[in-house]
A protein has these predicted regions:
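Membrane engagement elements in two modes
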Residues: 1-50, 59, 155-172
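Extracytoplasmic
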Residues: 34-36, 59-65, 81, 104, ...
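The feature marks short-to-medium sequence segments in extracytoplasmic or secretory-pathway proteins
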Residues: 47, 57-58, 71-117, 121-122, ...
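Short, well-ordered beta-strand segments enriched in hydrophobic/aromatic residues
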Residues: 64-72
């Protein structure tokens, strides 16, 4: 009961989250290291379909593709799904990560490898019409031991991130 009262009192005065987040701005074409990957975000574009993939045209939807070069600086394969955090785009749905060279789907990137990728989201056409630019966060990570005794190490997001604003080209 006492613990509950302490938590309620703490929440009333701003909660337990006192971590100061550190934001590192970067620009298109600049490298940003999140600890696991070195990321270079090149450009963003809206298209009706993703050629070479299973991204066929969908009524009322467009694809937002963000072209990125990624280098895995770690010693283990890294997952790609949550690598880019697309902000403030209503109704967005992550569609996948694809190799730029051939459109093949990619889920992980091995240690020491570099790949030019397209991260794609489906966005409602109504929201896409007003997209002049998009804000993307890349969360810094640390390689840490998991809490369970038999668990291995894992890349975990920290409270710090890099942030980039990328102009969006309309569909041609």
């Amino acid at each position: 009961m006492a613990l509950l009262l302490i938590l309620v009192a703490t929440a009333a005065f701003g909660g337990l989250d006192t971590v100061d987040k550190q934001v590192t701005p970067f620009k298109p074409g600049e490298e940003f290291s999140d600890g696991e990957y070195t990321v270079t975000i090149e450009r963003a574009r809206l298209v009706d379909e993703l050629k070479g993939t299973h991204g066929s045209p969908k009524p009322g939807k467009l694809y937002l593709g963000v072209v990125t070069t990624l280098r895995n600086d770690g010693t283990v394969p890294g997952r790609l799904r949550d690598q880019l955090d697309l902000r403030d785009v209503p109704g967005k749905e992550f569609f996948g990560a694809f190799r730029f060279r051939d459109g093949s789907s990619i889920q992980t990137l091995g240690p020491g490898l570099t790949e030019q990728l397209v991260f794609a989201w489906q966005v409602p056409e109504a929201a896409a019409q007003s997209l002049q630019e998009v804000t993307i966060r890349v969360w810094k990570k640390k390689f840490t031991q998991l809490m369970v005794a038999y668990g291995g190490k894992e890349w975990i997001d920290t409270d710090n991130y890099g942030q980039i604003v990328v102009p969006v080209k309309g569909s041609a």
